Amino acid sequence: MLLGASLVGVLLFSKLVLKLPWTQVGFSLLFLYLGSGGWRFIRVFIKTIRRDIFGGLVLLKVKAKVRQCLRERRTVPILFASTVRRHPDKTALIFEGTDTHWTFRQLDEYSSSVANFLQARGLASGDVAAIFMENRNEFVGLWLGMAKLGVEAALINTNLRRDALLHCLTTSRARALVFGSEMASAICEIHASLDPSLSLFCSGSWEPNAVPTSTEHLDPLLEDAPKHLPSCPDKGFTDKLFYIYTSGTTGLPKAAIVVHSRYYRMAALVYYGFRMRPNDIIYDCLPLYHSAGNIVGIGQCLLHGMTVVIRKKFSASRFWDDCIKYKCTIVQYIGELCRYLLNQPPREAENQHQVRMALGNGLRQSIWTNFSSRFHIPQVAEFYGATECNCSLGNFDSQVGACGFNSRILSFVYPIRLVRVNEDTMELIRGPDGICIPCQPGEPGQLVGRIIQKDPLRRFDGYLNQGANNKKIAKDVFKKGDQAYLTGDVLVMDELGYLYFRDRTGDTFRWKGENVSTTEVEGTLSRLLDMADVAVYGVEVPGTEGRAGMAAGASPTGNCDLERFAQDLEKELPLYARPIFLRILPELHKTGTYKLQKTELRKEGFDPAIVKDPLFYLDARKGRYVLLDQEAYSRIQAGEEKL
């Protein structure tokens, strides 16, 4: 009886809300009934139907708006123009560094002056111009102005130097480069290798002797440029908007293509899915050269009229003071930032704010509840999605630890799937028919999304490098002849359809026959050592199978009670997960999104001839960490030291 009622509910939702054809509804109900497992299906239905209906309605709303934008050939500048008309004198952007406030009218005029100036210098629709500067209001005005002209901005990571920086500028085929005065030394380092035809413009404080000789000071040139809207380029909703570069931790950075529809989709799904409001004020301390800061954050300003507070860089000590000063209601985060905030000593400001939502990704389950309760944040809005991916997820109901969900009842509505992979090689595991094998609840698998190029929500725009595209696409995934985007991320789905981020490729290693999760160990070590930054990775040891765990901890003073640490480890971690080697260094290098860079740490290993920082190893006989000198290293290499 209950099962029948549940199926009737699904039927009504599928037909009346999703407007699916009767044949698809009928087959779906049949398969659901046969595979429901009786009471389990009823339990899942009761616990998830409200969530699934809300998620379905959000998806339908965004789809409808996307179709309208497609028909009317709207672009981000056109959508921004309608925002300006709604409230021209409302504050759009606030730059915390100088307390500079820009209204929507001022942002519109600045971006139009950028478009008119570049047009006067010969740039046209389809050309590329690079932006290389730290966070500030002008960053937004620059790429928006380029978009008004149809020029595609290449947003360069400000941490890049020399070869990597030159690679990004060269592969983008930029005709012009706008750099902040704070980046002048980095440009001088590669100036001799740049294309002589590349126009250079410096924004910010002007010191002619600190920039390449051909550089022009942009700010006065923009002041003299017309502030009216230039003639609209022949651009549509699926045309290129700008390029965002990958972090480059596994090689040289790749330019991911962001089209207008992708920018809108990413911002809109977050806005409607997490129930944002036009009067919300967002605190955005994430890099604007990445999608989280520029699309998820700034997108709410340009498309939905919200005020965004921009900070040059994240500061744990100033975070809550800024939120109070600017009356922020939403803060953006990535997982590491939350840990930095929790490591700060308690203070009154952390409970005097008006923040109602923390929006971001990568918040570890182990600190989720502590973060939410300590800082009194009612809603943690966790989402999943890389710049180029077509299978974004949202945790719309704040399920602790989940990065999103997919309906177990109506899974066909959103064509994503977890498929079995060899977790060491990430090779897809296929059945006898050649199709990828879907994972069952509780079974880890790689997240994939079906590619449908005609659907802006399902398309894959990829990278400028076609070779990089081929590595991210697989065929015959859902069915014969189809294509799917490979995220490279391993997730796990529970019985209710919630998805949990397991580990990014390479974030596990095998030791003593067990898989060790670096993220879990890092969280434990960070707490025990009272260090904000701890990197855990596997290193090869001659004569042993797998990789031994090694931890690098950042301690400016170098002080660490290793005897107490070893005792605490015994209580906290199983033997196989305890790091064999320790490295204490002044600081750990991070990417622009505060992810720890482990590649060089792995390469250097535990050889004291290479590593000049203090090294220790876990002496199995003594049960504590002892100094790793050249003599001990030789014994380990010869297999004379038990690990």
Curated annotation (Swiss-Prot):
It catalyses: a fatty acid(in) = a fatty acid(out); (9Z,12Z)-octadecadienoate(out) = (9Z,12Z)-octadecadienoate(in); (9Z)-octadecenoate(out) = (9Z)-octadecenoate(in); hexadecanoate(out) = hexadecanoate(in). One of its GO terms (molecular function) is very long-chain fatty acid-CoA ligase activity. GO terms for cellular component: endoplasmic reticulum membrane; plasma membrane. The gene is SLC27A4. AMP binds at residues 243-254. Mediates the import of long-chain fatty acids (LCFA) into the cell by facilitating their transport across cell membranes. Appears to be the principal fatty acid transporter in small intestinal enterocytes. Also functions as an acyl-CoA ligase catalyzing the ATP-dependent formation of fatty acyl-CoA using LCFA and very-long-chain fatty acids (VLCFA) as substrates, which prevents fatty acid efflux from cells and might drive more fatty acid uptake. Plays a role in the formation of the epidermal barrier. Required for fat absorption in early embryogenesis. The lineage of its organism: Eukaryota, Metazoa, Chordata, Craniata, Vertebrata. The chain crosses the membrane at residues 20-42, 139-156. Its EC number is 6.2.1.15, 6.2.1.3, 6.2.1.-. Keywords: Endoplasmic reticulum, Fatty acid metabolism, Ligase, Lipid metabolism, Lipid transport, Membrane, Nucleotide-binding, Transmembrane, Transmembrane helix, Transport. It comes from Macaca fascicularis (Crab-eating macaque). SUPFAM superfamilies: Acetyl-CoA synthetase-like (SSF56801). It is found in: Endoplasmic reticulum membrane. The keyword Signal does not apply. This is Long-chain fatty acid transport protein 4. The keyword Kinase does not apply. It is a multi-pass membrane protein. Belongs to the ATP-dependent AMP-binding enzyme family. Pfam families: AMP-binding. One of its GO terms (biological process) is long-chain fatty acid import into cell.
